[in-house]
């Protein structure tokens, strides 16, 4: 079996092994190598093929006996193959990946003015692809160059924006490199960040009705191209779409919202068990962090202080991936919680008749539940992707949710 993997200095969690397992039958592992050990590893390491990531895409070039035309042009290598004579061949699959991402997005860049945010290694690749796709002009925005974030007004006529910076990437979610409202002619936003699934930049594009795409498709497409180089034969293009959808589903959080006592925690636990996922509960997390029940925290400090604690917890839970998350009934009263939950999640509103909602141990439910519901209803509607009736059995509710999730697999 071929020995392949991902080379970098600090890798942490990577989706690459899971993607490559879908593409080919070779061993794919992570290789964390310190800069001072890079040369030794490349000369003597026992590998047949490598992906290369930060900070080594240029550093590996002197160790290559030959480069592909695209790697030579970009002076960036993210694929290494050890040839039969022991020498290294360098290639670049990032350009293929970004090109595939643009085409899958349906966003046309031909004849349009494009801004590329960031001047790092990915920026050069993106610029090359945009030029190949016949963008009218391509301008790099950096922190200190001639075109920078302080004079973006020069480019208010931009029609395409591509983010190549790590701004908004996990774990520092919720921040954006630019405010898209500065660009009234925008026709498309592309963000090569793939974790979270929707960055703050992408969510603003979504809100403004601007076509967009996140970076997961690029990651999968470049992995397909890498596997073709490793294996020496073509792989069906449809595999990119299949794996992209599969990985997207696996990374997606399933979020439950609804009135206090509507069954969110119970359904979350059963759903997590059925899907072999981890169930998280924002109320339970608040209580764990503060050493007191939610009811006592509200009674002691007031609802506003409690909501601030809740938003902190939801921000932490929402940046995780592949979880089932039960939320507190009032989380929808804070708009900031929507972004935290939506960035990685599909949101289900569990609906239960008011006369079936328990009140004991819930200080905010002690009053007029009808008034509370009427006040929150628009918020639940705003947050929810889907609405599920939870007046029957847990099994019936699970079937409704699973039916929605299954439909998304098609």
Where are these regions (language model features)?
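ATP-dependent small-molecule kinase phosphotransfer cores
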Residues: 281-342
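NAD(P)-binding Rossmann-fold cofactor-contacting core
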Residues: 132-149, 283-290
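Phosphate/diphosphate ligand-binding glycine-rich loop within oxidoreductases
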Residues: 2-105, 196-198, 204, 208, ...
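Glycine-rich adenosine-cofactor-binding loop
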Residues: 8, 92-95, 102, 111-132, ...
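Rossmann-like adenosine-cofactor binding region
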Residues: 147-212, 331-337
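A glycine- and Lys/Arg-enriched "phosphate-lid" helix/loop adjacent to the NTP-binding pocket
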Residues: 343-379, 386
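Adenosine-phosphate binding glycine-rich loop
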Residues: 192-252, 390
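NTP-dependent small-molecule kinase module
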Residues: 241-249, 254, 270, 274, ...
């Amino acid at each position: 079996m071929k020995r392949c993997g991902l080379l970098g200095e600090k890798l942490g969690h990577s989706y690459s092994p899971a993607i490559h397992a879908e593409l080919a039958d070779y061993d794919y592992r992570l290789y964390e190598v310190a800069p001072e050990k890079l040369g030794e590893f490349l000369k003597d390491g026992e590998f047949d093929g490598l992906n290369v990531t930060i900070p080594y895409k240029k550093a590996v070039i002197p160790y290559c006996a030959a480069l592909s035309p695209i790697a030579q042009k970009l002076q960036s290598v993210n694929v290494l193959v050890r040839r039969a004579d022991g020498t290294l061949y360098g290639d670049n699959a990032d350009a293929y990946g970004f090109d595939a991402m643009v085409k899958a997005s349906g966003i046309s860049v031909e004849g349009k003015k494009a801004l590329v945010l960031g001047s790092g290694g990915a920026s050069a690749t993106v610029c090359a692809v945009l030029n190949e796709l016949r963008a009218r002009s391509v301008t790099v925005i950096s922190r200190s160059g001639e075109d920078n974030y302080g004079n973006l007004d020069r480019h208010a006529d931009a029609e395409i924006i591509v983010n190549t910076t790590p701004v908004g990437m996990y774990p520092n979610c919720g921040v954006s490199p630019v405010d898209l409202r500065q660009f009234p002619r925008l026709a498309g936003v592309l963000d090569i960040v793939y974790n979270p699934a929707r960055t703050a930049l992408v969510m603003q594009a979504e809100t403004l009705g601007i076509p967009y795409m996140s970076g997961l498709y690029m990651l999968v497409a470049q992995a397909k191209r890498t596997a073709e180089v490793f294996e020496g034969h073509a792989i069906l293009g449809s595999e990119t779409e299949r794996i992209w959808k599969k990985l997207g589903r696996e990374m997606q959080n399933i979020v439950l919202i609804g009135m206090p006592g509507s069954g969110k925690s119970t359904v979350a636990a059963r759903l997590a068990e059925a899907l072999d996922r981890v169930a998280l509960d924002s109320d339970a997390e608040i209580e764990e962090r503060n050493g007191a029940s939610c009811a006592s925290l509200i009674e002691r400090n007031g609802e506003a202080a409690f909501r601030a604690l809740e938003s902190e917890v939801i921000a932490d839970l929402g940046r995780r991936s592949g979880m089932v998350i039960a939320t507190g009934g009032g989380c929808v009263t804070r708009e900031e919680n929507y972004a935290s939950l939506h960035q990685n999640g599909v949101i289900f509103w569990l609906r239960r008749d008011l006369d079936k909602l328990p009140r004991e141990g819930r200080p905010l439910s002690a009053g007029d539940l009808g008034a509370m519901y009427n006040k929150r209803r628009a918020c639940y509607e705003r947050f929810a992707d889907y609405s599920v009736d939870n007046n029957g059995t847990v099994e019936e509710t699970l079937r409704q949710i699973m039916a929605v999730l299954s439909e998304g697999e098609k």
